Amino acid sequence: MDKNLKKEIENRRTFAIISHPDAGKTTLTEKFLLYGGAINTAGSVKGKANSKYAVSDWMGIEKERGISVTSSALQFNYEGYCINILDTPGHQDFSEDTYRTLMAADSAVMVIDASKGVEAQTIKLFKVCVMRHIPIFTFINKMDLEARDPYELLEEIENVLGIKTCPINWPIGSGKRFKGVYDRDTKKISMFQAVSVGGAKSAAETTYDLEDEAFKGEVGDELYDQLMDDVELLDGASEPFDQDLVDKGELSPVFFGSALTTFGIETFLEHFLKMTESPLPRMSDIGLIDPITEPFSGFVFKIQANMNKAHHDRIAFMRVCSGKFDATKDVFHVQSGKKMKLSRPQQIMAQDRKVIDEAYAGDVIGVFDPGIFSIGDTICTPGKKFTYEGIPTFAPEHFCRLVALDSMKRKQFMKGVTQIAQEGAIQIFQDYNLEMSEIIVGVVGTLQFDVLKYRMENEYSCDVRLEPLPYGHIRWVKDPATDLNSIKCPSDTKRVKDMKGNPLILFTNEWSIRLLLERNEGIELTEFKKN
């Protein structure tokens, strides 16, 4: 076995960061990059014309609004590890792209605002992590601002998300009285010191032992006594740390800190790297594929067109699952049955692209896509032929009719909407019985409608109108051979088909779904489509 290959793969960690809007996910991502030396200063991310943009935000609409619409892949080195972060959108409306990004991660970091606790978007993303049984780490952020009781926050995580928690460190006070954290592993106290917002790494932290008189003098009797009670209670009553349960995604290690002031980031990184594993074997149609002993293979989890308007290019993001990718060698695209060289392989950080010659299991690379790749495609070494488990298509929740304002631009219109749909940010449907019918667009989050309109007008020079539709649910009919015309549908439903001709039904509410199931014995409907 190639010892260098083994070492490279064992040093890799690939994780996604999930959170609700404004919980501090982008700030945390940037502070990680600061520690790895990937960037020099962190810009606080707001939608102001004169502010710095986050390193992971690149699309025009993202710059205008100061939000992350797409999911970016960022790589940095830290303490001998090569870390790949999959950054997911954190604004109110996210896309199916966000769910798919989690299919490429080996673990997830869940960022929670200490004043708000578990919020709606966190719950949606958490469900995908649970579906995949990946480890989930919790970073409770903004402890230097007004925060809820830490016990209350842990209880909410356990009750709402159904996962056990194990605090690795514990806060001493919060808001203006936030003094630092107690590390339950090392039994040391790190005193809170704020670093300026755009500053580099945190200032040298003052550390104390629990019994130090100097520490007691600095925090005062009330906070000291509270901490002593907390330590006793945690040691006696909290869930003990169990690496096996962490690996199965049943126990979440919890950390407290403040990303904006760079407090608690280094501690979190060090514990996280010890508690996570290098890339694990992945399931395919021929069984598990070992990341170290098997030659190169990977799968496409995201496609993005026009990442650089000057290039009019289309990039396929690929997660390398096994072996070493060598840019000089041919690869085999399983779905088309073709041998090819991957053109211009690169690592992408916002607008910066670095052309690479090689990549290892765990890495995420972008490759030029001439229009042959689809989400979920498998790419492997010639001579091998298998497919990784498909990435599910998730049911959209919002629907619009898309109309081209200039009927002479029908060709441009269809090209634009089809390309954007192939990237997976939107899904398109047509009437089940009519061939050249209206285009119905379905999205997971409504901001994708704005993104679609913006991109159709700016990238495809095609003015469009979006007409909202009353539907709030869509279901695939499990048997694709079903004739929808034979199904007794309630009057407020609509029969449609997707790009692949699969039959679906649009519903206005859940009552209509129940009514259809009652009227049609034996029919099976599903919320997501396995690909």
Regions found by a protein language model. Give the residues of each.
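Structural and coupling elements of P-loop NTPases
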Residues: 1-531
